[in-house]
Amino acid sequence: MRNKAHGFPHRISFDGEPDRAKHASKRANGTINTKPQERMHQANPDQ
């Protein structure tokens, strides 16, 4: 087989536990962007 390394493990592995909430992306103030529509309405109160 050309251009393929033999005996190397696969780079992507889905084994193990899923990501935990403590690793979830958050803003600096600790909030998560779960309701963008609500945030947009707060930013534009005249509409």
Swiss-Prot record:
- Superkingdom per UniProt: Bacteria
Q: Where is the composition biased (Basic and acidic residues)?
A: 12-22
**Location (main, coarse):** other
**Pfam entry (one):** SspK
What is the annotated localization of this protein? Spore core
Task: Print the keywords alphabetically.
Answer: Sporulation
Q: Which GO terms describe its cellular component?
A: endospore-forming forespore
Q: What is this protein called?
A: Small, acid-soluble spore protein K
Organism from which the protein derives: Halalkalibacterium halodurans (strain ATCC BAA-125 / DSM 18197 / FERM 7344 / JCM 9153 / C-125)
Organismal lineage: Bacteria, Bacillati, Bacillota, Bacilli, Bacillales
